A protein has these predicted regions:
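Glycine-rich, proline-tolerant flexible connector loops at the mouths of alpha/beta enzymes
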Residues: 38-58, 117-118
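N-terminal small/glycine-rich loop or linker at the start of catalytic domains
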Residues: 1-13, 70-81, 118-125
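Histidine-acidic metal/acid-base catalytic patches
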Residues: 1-35, 58, 62, 80, ...
Length: 285
């Protein structure tokens, strides 16, 4: 399946998009040849709107035979942004409401939690006890989020943003080793991984069975951009072959951030053409 991340919707309608904007966007997506889309609440102020109007969006998606591939809880970046937020219950009750919204989309089995760049005062330093307190707090909070998501019958994926306390995929592996948790997975955001200096070609094998979704975008590894695949220097043959070779059966979802709505159709068409070419040429498909 080829789909799009929420970047499609905020590129068309700004980050203050409404549920009605999503419905309009689905109709455009259908005409552009996509069959998957990702749900998102960008601003917490929209939470009640989504609680009351998600059913209408789900009905329109069914009418168009469009499938929600994951829910990105973008507004929950706040839950891991700094020490005070991290070491509190911030976001846990909101995640329960996210599961209520996602329940309107029975085929949507993944909820993605983006991890915020971690903030601290300029000039701050940490001793080993301070670091351990933060790390333990992060592990505890991720387990709490996972418990809520899994109680709804879904899986939790992490979107590892550059600068987050988790650090990268090695942080996810460490979390798994230290807590024994094997169910929390990874939303493979190629742009984030590449700008974190990850060895991107190895990630599908390294996290085989733990990649629950994708945000497929390009950049040049030194800036966290969201360009169409083919406009940066990511090796897309390696990424796509690796995913297929290691059993990934989910949607291939583009994430392209456009500066103006007028650019959206062409940018996503270009990205889609690149993915179709690479998928079509893969010997692992």
């Amino acid at each position: 399946m080829l789909g799009v991340s929420p970047a499609y919707f905020f590129s068309r309608f700004t980050t203050d998009f409404t549920v009605d904007d999503y419905i309009q966007g689905l109709e455009l997506l259908k005409s552009e040849g996509f069959s998957g889309f990702q749900l998102e609440i960008f601003h917490r102020s929209r939470l009640n709107e989504w609680l009351s109007e998600a059913a209408a969006l789900a009905k329109r998606a069914d009418d168009l035979n469009m499938e929600a591939t994951q829910f990105v809880a973008h507004f929950l970046l706040a839950a891991t942004k700094d020490e005070a937020s991290l070491l509190s219950d911030l976001g846990l009750e909101d995640m329960k409401q996210v599961t209520d919204i996602t329940a309107h989309f029975p085929r949507c089995r993944v909820i993605t939690l983006p991890l915020s760049p971690f903030s601290f005062q300029a000039g701050s330093s940490f001793d080993i006890d301070s670091w351990r307190r933060l790390w333990d707090g992060l592990c505890e909070k991720l387990l709490a989020f996972a418990s809520i998501v899994e109680a709804s019958g879904r899986k939790l994926a992490l979107e590892i943003v550059p600068g987050s306390l988790l650090g990268g995929t090695e942080g996810l592996m460490r979390f798994s080793r230290e807590t024994g948790n094997k169910s929390v997975g990874y939303n493979f955001d190629t742009g984030h991984a590449w700008s974190c200096k990850e060895n991107i070609a190895t990630l599908p094998a390294k996290l085989a069975g733990r990649i629950y979704g994708t945000h497929l975008k390009d950049n040049f590894s030194y800036e966290n951009l969201a360009l169409p695949p083919g406009e940066g220097n990511i090796s897309w043959d390696s990424v796509i072959d690796g995913l297929l070779r290691n059993g990934y059966a989910g949607s291939f979802d583009l994430e392209i951030a456009c500066k103006t709505p007028a650019e959206v159709t062409a940018a996503y068409a270009k990205g889609k053409a690149t993915l179709e070419r690479v998928l079509g040429a893969s010997k692992y498909r």
